[in-house]
């Protein structure tokens, strides 16, 4: 039995030593070059792209795994591939310093399946999605998603729980995580105007706020000609951006094209 650690109260101010964000979320509209920028990251750092989007990285050089090996892969098959890859990464946790999850909307989509299985394992759902005493699987005749079964949005509790469980699992796999996500428009209040258009993470319901509160830094990928910036500026009450890391503020150049049209990335401005 190990000796119990003695707790002591501090007398001095502790200087913060952490300089890199453990969780970085990059949000953008489609076709902004986010995949190419993240793919380039894997050539410079010990990183892996966990591609959850069908065809997301088929034209991008990267250290990557995809849950959609072909265009014919179904959502049910992709979910099975996701679980197998996730478990393999857990078995070899620490193999990569950085895990890139692209994208969050696809993980949210799979949460309908994962959340249903989670409910089926609960006391409340012990008879749900059964036939002859056997558990049904997604795609089987008679299989019902939990959000379509529980009334008044009760099913979303289970999909949210499964989603956040995956986020905690990713923390076990690698010390640093990068998440790619799409944006959706949001009408927000402004002190000068009644309503203005802002942006937020494209996730279901309360999940966008819950997830955003759990990560270190959020940035919106913006364009200026051939240059791409990570914008950490917080506008109004939008949850699109912000960072607990004092190093990540304002707009930071993340990529640009050289005279030959090659993309040059500047990840050293984000990670030491």
Per-range role (PLM):
Residues 4-101, 105-110:
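Conserved P-loop
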Residues 36-41, 169, 210-211:
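Hydrophobic/aromatic ligand-binding patch that stacks against planar heteroaromatic rings
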Residues 47, 177, 218-220:
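Short, well-ordered beta-strand core segments
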Residues 50-52, 180, 221:
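Generic beta-sheet signal
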Residues 94, 172, 213:
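Structured loop/turn residues at beta-strand edges in well-structured enzyme cores
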Residues 103-210:
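P-loop NTPase motor core
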Residues 185-272:
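Conserved GTP-binding G-domain of TRAFAC-class P-loop NTPases and closely related GTPase folds
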């Amino acid at each position: 039995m190990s000796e119990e650690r003695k707790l002591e109260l501090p007398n001095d101010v502790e200087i913060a030593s952490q300089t890199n964000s453990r969780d970085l979320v990059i949000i953008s509209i489609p076709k902004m070059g986010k995949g190419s920028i993240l793919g380039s990251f894997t050539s410079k750092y010990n990183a892996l792209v966990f591609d959850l989007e069908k065809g997301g990285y088929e034209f991008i050089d990267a250290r990557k795994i995809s849950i959609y090996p072909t265009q014919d892969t179904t959502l049910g098959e992709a979910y099975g591939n996701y679980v197998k890859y996730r478990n393999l990464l857990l078995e070899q946790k620490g193999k990569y310093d950085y895990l890139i999850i692209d994208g969050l909307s696809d993980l949210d989509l799979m949460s309908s399946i994962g959340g249903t299985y989670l409910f089926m394992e609960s006391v409340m759902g012990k008879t749900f999605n059964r036939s002859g005493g056997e558990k049904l699987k997604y795609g089987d005749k008679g299989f019902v998603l939990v959000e379509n079964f529980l009334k008044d949005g009760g099913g979303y509790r289970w999909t949210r729980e499964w989603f956040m469980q995956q986020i905690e699992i990713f923390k076990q796999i690698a010390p640093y995580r990068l998440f790619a996500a799409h944006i959706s428009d949001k009408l927000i209040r402004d002190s000068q105007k009644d309503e203005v258009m802002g942006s937020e993470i494209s996730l279901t319901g309360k999940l966008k706020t819950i997830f955003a509160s759990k990560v270190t830094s959020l940035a919106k990928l913006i364009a200026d000609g051939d240059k791409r910036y990570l914008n950490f500026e917080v506008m109004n009450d939008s949850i699109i951006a912000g960072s607990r890391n004092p190093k990540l503020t304002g707009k930071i150049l993340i990529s640009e094209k050289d005279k030959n049209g090659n993309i040059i990335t500047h990840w050293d401005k984000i990670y030491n």
